[in-house]
Amino acid sequence: MKIGFNEGCNRFCENHSVLEDLDLCEKYGVDYIDIQSECLDREIAAGKYTIDDLAAWFADPKHHLKMLSYNALIFFNMKQTQEEKDAVMAKLDQIIEDCNKLQCKMIVVVPSMDLTVPATLD
């Protein structure tokens, strides 16, 4: 049996850290981690590390923890304008590039919840 950790379980905890999650997963024998994009993006924007730093961590043979999935491309569907669609595709392209560096083969997608128009046509 393999054990995975969903970072969504603690993403709102005070002083949350992706790197600390990685270390704790290693310490307690977790096999896979589902990294939350909002946590990752927040810490990269704050200059705590880069995607390349994180990729080096996962590539280091002393670590057994693997990345299960990138969570998530959010609110990707039901876009009304070409500009909105292009923005989603640009974000997806960036996620794919990052996932390739992180040796991650799965992307979680979350459908839109904030629709102002009906999702179906009559």
Sequence positions of predicted segments:
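Boundary/entry segment of secreted carbohydrate-active catalytic domains
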Residues: 1-16
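Hydrophobic faces of well-ordered beta-strands that scaffold small-molecule active sites
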Residues: 3-7, 33-35, 66-72, 107-109
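Short, contiguous strand/loop micro-motifs
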Residues: 7-9, 40-42, 75, 79-83, ...
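Residue-level marker of alpha-helix boundaries and capping positions
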Residues: 11-13, 45, 86
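Active-site acidic/histidine proton-transfer and metal-coordination neighborhood
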Residues: 16-23, 78-122
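Acidic (Asp/Glu)-rich catalytic clusters
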Residues: 20-29, 46-69, 90-103
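N-terminal substrate-binding region of glycoside hydrolase catalytic domains
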Residues: 24, 28-46, 71-76
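Glycine-rich, proline-tolerant flexible connector loops at the mouths of alpha/beta enzymes
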Residues: 34-60, 111-119
